[in-house]
UniProtKB/Swiss-Prot annotation:
Domain-level remarks: The last Arg residue of the ACP-binding site is essential for the weak association between ACP/AcpP and FabH.
Protein location: Cytoplasm
Taxonomic source organism: Vibrio vulnificus (strain YJ016)
EC number(s) per entry: 2.3.1.180
CC terms in the record's Gene Ontology section: cytoplasm
Region of interest called ACP-binding, as start-end residue ranges on this chain: 252-256
The protein's name: Beta-ketoacyl-[acyl-carrier-protein] synthase III 2
Length: 362
């Protein structure tokens, strides 16, 4: 029987143009650029003027062009997101519609910030079954929709964006070699939006104002433990040591978590690709955006061993070992772009900030 693998043949990203800086946040929160940078590593984040599916579509078009295939070649679409345009139907179907794909399997996957790693594992195994030839794996979020802009601890962390990869079936031993995903359910309440969905009071007067539970110290401890143990597992399973890893693509949640993960794993911090300073935490989109930029900037070379690691609400966690193929250059480029935005980030958030502050003052 033929052994199939799922090579990453295309990569793309989409970042909305409106930039919300730390200084912008200090105009309506008790914070400062220094306070945010020293605690998180974040300097800016993006605020979207369009829906999550629009971000996902642009990232997908870039990935398709770089893979040198057409949308009609895709027979599987997985969108990792916890901020979809709608609950019913899924937004993978919207991406499929936007790309004018006639027939493909399409579904959303919610593992919060670990979503892309879960999606990559799922897509890879489906391709290895022999049933699919080309898959789009997308991480896309519009987290600004959820944020309580009167709550400093979370308002400074998150941003909007999308990243995508194309997986293509091959007999060469490249792509995701193995992964370890899991969930620490005892910590599910320390990072959550608990009253969104059927648990909410549908007719309550304050619908639309969701509590965002965030217990930072406990999240830090559990995140490092979950990612660290998953990373150790995939290396042991592959018979590799830390020295065999060329590049680490970690979830971009907090610079201190990234540094601690590397230190505990014995991996030099210089091997970790970091772009949290530009985009903040884009949840399921952080890993594919970082992967895309690592390729674009020449950090990933042909044949590299790449360690992915992430954690998220649930508390989900996961790591994966990717063997890069021989091609690091795009076959072609796409001119896909979002519609123009004529507002600043603060202008886009004006009503949300006012309403969140009014609720806090009640």
């Amino acid at each position: 029987m033929t052994n199939y693998y799922a090579e990453i043949t295309g990569w793309g990203k989409c970042l909305p143009p409106a930039v919300l800086s730390n200084d912008d946040l200090s105009t309506f929160l008790d914070t400062s650029d220094e306070w945010i940078r020293t605690r998180t590593g974040i300097e800016n984040r993006r605020i979207s003027h369009v829906n999550t599916s629009d971000l996902a579509t642009v990232a997908a078009k870039q990935a398709l062009a770089r893979a040198g295939i057409t949308a009609q070649d895709i027979d599987l679409i997985i969108v990792a997101t916890c901020s979809p345009d709608s609950l019913i139907p899924n937004i993978a179907s919207m991406v499929q519609k936007n790309l004018e794909i006639e027939a493909a399997a399409a579904f959303d996957l919610n593992a919060a910030c670990t979503g892309f790693v879960y999606g990559l594992e799922t897509g890879t195994r489906l391709i290895q079954s022999g049933a699919y030839r080309h898959a789009l794996i997308i991480g896309a979020e519009r987290l600004s929709f959820y944020i309580d802009w009167a709550m400093r601890d979370t308002a400074v962390l998150f941003g909007d964006g999308a990243g995508a990869v194309v997986l293509s079936r091959t007999e060469e031993a490249v792509g995701l070699q193995n992964a370890k995903i899991g969930c620490d359910a005892q910590g599910r309440d320390i990072l959550s939006v608990p009253k969104f969905g059927t648990s909410m009071d549908r007719f309550a007067a304050d619908n639309g104002y969701w509590d965002f539970n965030f217990v930072g110290k406990e999240i830090f401890k559990r995140a490092v433990k979950g990612m660290g143990s998953a990373a150790a597992h995939v290396l042991a399973h592959a018979g590799m040591s830390k020295d065999d890893i060329n590049v680490v693509i970690p979830h971009q949640a907090n610079i201190r978590i990234i540094q601690t993960l590397c230190d505990l794993s014995g991996i030099d911090q210089s091997k970790a690709f970091v772009n949290i300073q530009k985009y903040g935490n884009t949840s399921a989109a952080t890993v594919p955006i970082a992967l895309c930029e690592a390729v674009e900037q020449g950090h990933i070379k042909a044949g590299d061993n790449i360690l992915l690691a992430a954690f998220g609400a649930g508390l989900t966690w996961g790591a994966g070992l990717v063997k890069w193929g021989q091609r690091v250059e795009a076959i072609s480029e796409s001119d896909a772009a979002l519609p123009e935005c004529d507002k600043s980030a603060l202008e886009l958030l004006k009503n949300a900030i006012e309403l969140c502050n009014a609720r806090r003052d009640k």
